[in-house]
């Protein structure tokens, strides 16, 4: 009789311990899910900011291209004025050849590799029988399975986000290099054009 009582007490203790572990495990999966959802939100915000930054860089590069176009017109006008005034020196050819590097490497385009939009798809990670080994086989373990499935899907999305961010950052770094080259080229051409114009006005 005493042995039966001891066994019942031991079984009750085991059941209580199993319930405690189930509660702790459930809370753990809830925290995991909350953390990966916060990471996903941060990733989405980062992608949006990168996209906005890409648009700003595109506008800046378009401005550099427009300045280049305007400078071609200004240099042509200075050439015509130089011929009219009898000035033979024509550094425009030299300027154009020196600027060719800056203006000849835009083949990849500003938005050549925009990041692919992240699709909220869950990667199929479920194993037959679920993610956990059943002990209590109740609603808590069902929720644990669901939480872990969502965690797995979000982690898959985070991986895609990281790849998209890396691609976009690489694209923007190349674009920033182009913008710097074009800005240097434009500044040089503007300075030289100003010197020529000043010389013409002084000689007149």
Curated annotation (Swiss-Prot):
The organism's place on the tree of life at top rank: Eukaryota
Gene3D superfamilies in the cross-refs: 1.20.5.110
Gene that this sequence comes from: snap25a
Keyword set, alphabetical order: Cell membrane, Coiled coil, Membrane, Repeat, Synapse, Synaptosome
Species classification: Eukaryota, Metazoa, Chordata, Craniata, Vertebrata
Major site of localization recorded for this protein: other
Entry GO terms, CC: cytoplasm; membrane; neuron projection; plasma membrane; presynapse; SNARE complex; synaptobrevin 2-SNAP-25-syntaxin-1a-complexin I complex
UniProt-annotated stretches for the region Disordered: 1-25
Annotated ranges, domain t-SNARE coiled-coil homology: 19-81, 138-200
Protein name in the entry: Synaptosomal-associated protein 25-A
UniProt note on tissues of expression: Expressed in several regions throughout the adult brain, including the mesencephalon.
Family: Belongs to the SNAP-25 family.
